[in-house]
Amino acid sequence: MLVGKISGYEDNTRSLERETSEITSLLSQFPGNTNVLVVDTNFTTLLNMKQIMKQYAYQVSIETDAEKALAFLTSCKHEINIVIWDFHMPGIDGLQALKSITSKLDLPVVIMSDDNQTESVMKATFYGACDYVVKPVKEEVMANIWQHIVRKRLIFKPDVAPPKPRMTWSEVFQPVQSHLVPTDGLDRDHFDSITINGGNGIQNMEKKQGKKPRKPRMTWTEELHQKFLEAIEIIGGIEKANPKVLVECLQEMRIEGITRSNVASHLQKHRINLEENQIPQQTQGNGWATAYGTLAPSLQGSDNVNTTIPSYLMNGPATLNQIQQNQYQNGFLTMNNNQIITNPPPPLPYLDHHHQQQHQSSPQFNYLMNNEELLQASGLSATDLELTYPSLPYDPQEYLINGYNYN
């Protein structure tokens, strides 16, 4: 296993050395041994380009006639390495020269022109031009014109390739940004192609042009809300309203584009709004007792009030009238037209066990005393009670216990 690894390492080393030596030999040939043919009708332009390229050790030949230039290439095809031809050359223009040279001589051709129209650049590239430059040609462009020759030769020598750039450990283990790389699932629907080059850190993503359109948002206008209320009345009120029936009713009113979810959401908001508006109105109109009457039923009416006296407080049968309904206003016992008891009623007498047995065993009190006899026995009169408790809303005589001595 170790021998195989060493052998593979040696093969890679020899391949790298061979590629490096061949590239070094190519670099030694340029630009000093480069023969260039420049074809243009403007003789001044030719002289200027020739003078500049000679500074970079190019061997330059110039020609103002297209046919003579093409004949010169045919006669000395092994001496010219690259051709620069004017796009608007009379007789044989740049496109015709491209067709002839690339098919017969297979030389790199650079097209130069006074304009840089997209159509001209596209045609020149389509017919095989290796570059398209605008006149006057810049000096740095002419200085590096030899690169097209090297590129052409590398195409015919696929085994010769430039050495791979050495990568540092930080570049090798540099994580790819997660937000640029789509994962399996839904993210793949948003990307057409992915290009990731770890050597130079290039990361390119092309997004899809077509995206799913967003659904239009439903807006409840005043007119549409009125139609909504009419539909609720038609189906029998808010208690019977449901989204499915409301949608059908609104569609019958020729309202288009409304969905069940729209109606359900609006119906929920409408019910909440009704509840919020109903509670303050009840509180303001009827008071707290009416608004929350259901929470305290013991305060409503005489049916829920215990108006009888326990049997162990009475020596004999006693009949008491129930408190009238009109004595309770808003669930409170009104005293002196206020809801606060200012003068408490007389306390009920306390009877211990001895007195209770005495009164129960005494036969002389086993009859019902009327009010006059009770007042005479106690020494009190109705006038005294009224003066003592002038604001009582009930008759004190009704609550006097028969047979009890109040003196």
Swiss-Prot record:
Superkingdom of this protein's organism: Eukaryota
Matches recorded under PROSITE patterns: RESPONSE_REGULATORY
UniProt motif (Nuclear localization signal) ranges: 214-217
InterPro entries: ARR-like, CheY-like_superfamily, Homeodomain-like_sf, Myb_dom_plants, Response_reg_B-typ_pln, Sig_transdc_resp-reg_receiver
Gene3D superfamilies: 3.40.50.2300, Homeodomain-like
GO terms under cellular component: nucleus
Free-text description of this protein's post-translational modifications in UniProt: Two-component system major event consists of a His-to-Asp phosphorelay between a sensor histidine kinase (HK) and a response regulator (RR). In plants, the His-to-Asp phosphorelay involves an additional intermediate named Histidine-containing phosphotransfer protein (HPt). This multistep phosphorelay consists of a His-Asp-His-Asp sequential transfer of a phosphate group between first a His and an Asp of the HK protein, followed by the transfer to a conserved His of the HPt protein and finally the transfer to an Asp in the receiver domain of the RR protein.
DNA-binding residues: 217-271
UniProt tissue specificity: Detected in trichomes and siliques.
Protein family: Belongs to the ARR family. Type-B subfamily.
Name of the featured protein: Putative two-component response regulator ARR19
Organism: Arabidopsis thaliana
Encoding gene, per UniProt annotation: ARR19
